Amino acid sequence: MSTKRLNSKHIHAHMKSAFNYADCSTAEKLKVGCVLVKDDRIISIGYNGMPPGWSNTCETLSFFNEFGKQLPTQVLVTKPEVLHAEENAITKLARSTESGEGATAFITHAPCLSCAKLLYSSGIVEVYYVHEYRDTAGIYFLNQCKIGVNQFADN
């Protein structure tokens, strides 16, 4: 496990990198970025988007929301195939020679429960995020796992 602590200047830089990678997303509704750092070195990055080789269109117009509820007008609905930023970062990490053991995740938005489970299972020991997610189950899970969770003030 990594014992090297990040200083405030580097925390800001890595969080800024997460936002820069979020800008690479082709999603229209929400752009999310994730940077995995170990020993103050980036070991993987990810942003939300379609799987490799698929069309880069992350949403579709629909009269139904993500939960199947009918709506009076069409709205943009995220396609179920879209990978979250954390999923992309972790799958890239899995294909590398690096390990997530002892790493820190910098994410533009708090992780959902599924991504929180992936972060924990990958050995991530600390998570920084700026924006809340629509539910707090992911943060609750990370806290239960004794993962350091820090909401970063957006300056």
How would you label these PLM feature ranges?
Residues 1-155:
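Zinc-dependent deaminase catalytic domain
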